[in-house]
Each structure stands twice: as C-alpha cells, then as structure tokens.
C-alpha cells in the first residue's frame, strides 16, 4: 500500500505529518493582510508554494504521496488569488479546500474526542476559529494572523486598545450555541504555545503541555504579560521566534471565544486537524 503524508495549508503556517509520525512546520503567513485586501498576496503565495515544494520533496524521500487540505486563508481569498494559488499548489500535490465545519470535524477526530459527545473542542488557527461538539460545529473567520492585522490597523498598540479592536471585530463573526459543556480540548499553535509558556518552558514538551490545564484567568494573565514584555523580548523567546507578533492578538481571539462560550479551562492537545486528515487519507485514499 502506498505510504501517505498529510499537509495542512494553514493561514499562519504549512505543516506536514509523514508516514512515520514525522512533523514539519514552515511559517508562511498565507493570510497576511487578507483582512484589508481580501486576497492572498503574491509574496505569501510565493512563500507557501516554496513550502509545499519542500514538503513534497520530503514526502517523496519517504516514499509517501502527499495530500493537502487548505483552510481559512484559501477558503476566503478573492480576486482570483484563490484560483491562482490552487492552480500552483495543485501542480505539486492534490489540495482539498475544507469548509469551516469540515475543518472542525477533522480537528475533533485528530484530538481523539470523536467518540466523546460530552466534550467540546476549540481550534484556533491563523485565519479562523472553530468550536465543535456533538451536534454543533461553528467556524468564525478570525484567527491570530487576521487579529494581528486588525490590531495593526485599528488599535494604538496598548493592551486595552488591542483587546477592544479584536473583540469588536469578533462580534457578529461568532455564533455561540446555548449549550453547557464542561470539558474542552484546545488545539492550534496559539493554545499549545500558551500552555508551554504557562509552565515556564523554553523548549516545547508535548507531554508537559498535554498534562496541564489552561484556565481562562491564566490565559488573560499571560496575554497581559506577553504584551508588557514587548515584541523585542517576545521575539527572543525560543517558543515565540515565529509567533512573537501574533501571540497576543491570537490570545485575545481565544479569550473572546472562551468568554462567549463560557469555557473556564482548556486541555491543550498537539493532535489536531492535521492528525484527523492523516487518518482520513489513510482510510480513504
């Protein structure tokens, strides 16, 4: 049977999961400035196509065929940029554009709660945020990269101004089902990075991260501390090298979603939609 590799074309990064569990991540910021322009920039497309070529070569070296899925940035892009990107990417590997609900479903499968109807999942990416449990799946076009663009354009840089700008932008984008769920899994780089930072880690430790409970109060405190530290300090932190400018905006989106859904705490998980899609292609392709 042909080995397979899954590739996630995200709004902040492009990731791959290989046949032996190997993971790669390349930050490309595909959704950069999409809030103001409505399209994928030429530079972002170029970075992302280069990343796909690199990951395709890696899969080939492992004897695997790569299958990619695209999320919010590609899903929402206009003015021909979506078609241009998909044409270029399709020459490298098959690409499926997921709906927000499909994205949430694969995340739930990947996180291992597909058979846990009483659990909820929040998936915060670069361009969108999904809330999902048994009976509902909600996707809002707001993630850490889009939130950064909003903060750059609509705030004065202070924490309160950034919070106000992000919360204002989130209003009307999120739909919160009237349902009470006690246990929540949190996936996506913003959430797992916050969990690592809450533990004082300077090197990512998957076991430690997935063993912690990330409360809303702790997230709020971290958000303020990260803002107070300044971008220069954040950029020198080993866990924030490529996330230093989106971690605070992304955390504000997370706080808005948790507040709206009444989520008091999250169980962070590294396994997410990429893992779910890998399971899918292994069973169906």
Predicted feature locations:
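Short, glycine-rich, amphipathic interfacial segments at transmembrane boundaries or analogous
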Residues: 27-29
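A short catalytic or substrate-binding loop motif that flags glycine-/basic-rich loops and adjacent residues
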Residues: 8-11, 249
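Helical "lid/coupling" subdomains associated with nucleotide-phosphate turnover
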Residues: 4, 18, 22-24, 33-57, ...
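Conserved Rossmann-like nucleotide-cofactor binding loop
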Residues: 12-14, 127
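Two-metal-ion RNase H-like nuclease active-site motif
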Residues: 3-9, 119-122
